[in-house]
Amino acid sequence: MERTLTILKPDCVRKQLIGAVIDQIERAGFRVVAMKKIRLTQETAGEFYAVHRERPFYGELVEFMSSGPCVPIILEKENAVADFRTLIGATDPAQADAGTVRKLYADSKGENIVHGSDSEENAAIEAGFFFSAEEVVRSN
């Protein structure tokens, strides 16, 4: 069973869409194995997104991700990484397919509701950033 990490971003929390997005995720066959609500500091957000440090949007991304609470979640499903990226849609909601999370709920490329890991390797690294082994529930 493959795992991926998602983060319901501050805009998702602010718009009170946590339940709606999790419902869509679970209806797509994903199982939640770890979840918590946290508020990232600018330093922690900067560490998580360090791979983007040289990109022009880095400062804005760190500012946004530390602007309010977010909800990191570890999900489990066969082909979890690819299937989740399909479910959430393109980074820019204007280019996302109909019915995807971002098409339904996101306002802009910068505030696009949800993060999704881009590879199995990164999913494991990102999951470890937010969760200890003890916080992850083994599925049956």
UniProtKB/Swiss-Prot annotation:
Catalyzed reactions: a 2'-deoxyribonucleoside 5'-diphosphate + ATP = a 2'-deoxyribonucleoside 5'-triphosphate + ADP; a ribonucleoside 5'-diphosphate + ATP = a ribonucleoside 5'-triphosphate + ADP
Keywords assigned by UniProt, alphabetized: ATP-binding, Cytoplasm, Kinase, Magnesium, Metal-binding, Nucleotide metabolism, Nucleotide-binding, Phosphoprotein, Transferase
Compartment annotation: Cytoplasm
Protein name per Swiss-Prot or TrEMBL: Nucleoside diphosphate kinase
Broad enzyme group: transferase
HAMAP family assigned to the protein according to its UniProt record, in alphabetical order: NDP_kinase
Record InterPro entries: NDK-like_dom, NDK-like_dom_sf, Nucleoside_diP_kinase, Nucleoside_diP_kinase_AS
UniProt-listed SUPFAM superfamilies: Nucleoside diphosphate kinase, NDK (SSF54919)
Organism, scientific name: Pelodictyon phaeoclathratiforme (strain DSM 5477 / BU-1)
Biological function: Major role in the synthesis of nucleoside triphosphates other than ATP. The ATP gamma phosphate is transferred to the NDP beta phosphate via a ping-pong mechanism, using a phosphorylated active-site intermediate.
Active site: residue positions: 115
Main subcellular localisation: cytoplasm
GO terms classed as biological process: CTP biosynthetic process; GTP biosynthetic process; UTP biosynthetic process
Lineage, uppermost ranks: Bacteria, Pseudomonadati, Chlorobiota, Chlorobiia, Chlorobiales
Chain residues that bind ATP: 9, 57, 85, 91, 102, 112
Residue stretches spanning the membrane: none
GO molecular function annotations of the record: ATP binding; metal ion binding; nucleoside diphosphate kinase activity
NCBIfam families referenced in this protein's UniProt entry, alphabetically: PRK00668.1, PRK14541.1
The protein's required cofactors: Mg(2+)
Self-association state and partner proteins as the record states: Homotetramer.
EC number(s) stated in the UniProt entry for this protein: 2.7.4.6
Gene Ontology CC terms, in alphabetical order: cytoplasm
Pfam families: NDK
